[in-house]
A protein has these predicted regions:
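Intrinsically disordered, low-complexity domain-flanking/linker segments in eukaryotic proteins
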Residues: 187-195
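Non-heme Fe(II)/2-oxoglutarate
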Residues: 1-102
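Conserved double-stranded beta-helix
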Residues: 74, 80, 91-148
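Catalytic core of non-heme Fe(II) oxygenases with the double-stranded beta-helix
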Residues: 118-176, 193, 200-206, 211-225
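A structural signal for short, well-ordered beta-strand segments and their strand-loop junctions
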Residues: 35-37, 107-109, 170-171, 207
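Active-site loop architecture of trypsin-fold serine endopeptidases
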Residues: 183, 195-198
């Protein structure tokens, strides 16, 4: 989760933060991201799409313990959840897997899942300090083709990453600009040959965020300085 940024803001943050989140994984250091196949069982992450809009900020362990914000702050018209109870223990379990991959100890900060709908995009941005080491996990979708997540590498190339359900893209959230182009709309023909937009399409993913235990952002553990 990040506030919308201008391109100038993104460029400034990239220049300011590049090289500040060192790990022991050579490929991760070179590219600023890493695809982790089969990171988690997508069935354990699945939640039914209800075609809602807005943002639910959870404060308790029950699914009815949340505050609803009618307008999602980053992707207008989407439906997102901050600290949904279903993912609470998974957040820590995934952290243990990522620590082995990067060779560094991590602290949990927060997690955030979002249902995107056709026509919606994630504008280019770099993340706030609590998202130093992050992973975006594809949960489920019912669209025709895999929808890519884009990321800019430290050497200036824009890479397109397509994930299967359960796969994750591990990335340096504060350092590497990332985005999604609009989720394509799909159409069907009626009995009369009229082209109409398909309804009920979605793409669901979850971000799990962490900070390096020995890094300059360690005090953001638990998302305590948001």
């Amino acid at each position: 989760m990040a506030e919308k940024m201008t391109l100038k803001d993104v460029e400034f943050q990239e220049k300011l933060n590049t090289g500040t989140s060192k790990t022991n994984n050579e490929s991760f250091e070179k590219n600023g991201y890493l695809v982790v196949k089969d990171l988690w069982n997508p069935d354990e992450l699945y939640r039914e799409n209800t075609n809602e809009e807005g943002q639910k900020n959870y404060w308790g362990k029950r699914e009815d313990q949340f505050k609803l914000i009618p307008k999602e702050m980053q992707v207008e018209g989407s439906h997102s959840s901050y600290w949904h109870p279903q993912y609470r223990s998974i957040h820590s379990q995934i952290r243990l897997k990522l620590e082995k991959i990067i060779g560094k100890k991590l602290y949990n900060t927060y997690y955030y899942d979002r249902f995107y709908y056709p026509g919606q995009a994630l504008t280019i941005h770099a993340d706030r300090p609590a998202c130093e080491i992050s992973v975006s996990v594809h949960i489920s979708d019912n669209v025709k083709e895999r929808w890519p997540l884009w990321i800019k590498t430290p050497y200036g190339e824009n890479h397109s990453v397509k994930l299967d359900p359960g796969d994750g893209m591990l990335y340096k959230g504060c350092e590497r600009p990332h985005w999604r182009d609009p989720l394509p709309k799909e159409y069907r023909r009626t009995w009369y040959g009229i082209k109409v937009e398909k309804k009920g399409l979605y793409y669901h993913q979850v971000f799990f965020h962490y900070v390096l235990a020995d890094g300059v952002r360690s005090h953001f553990a638990g998302d305590s300085c948001k």
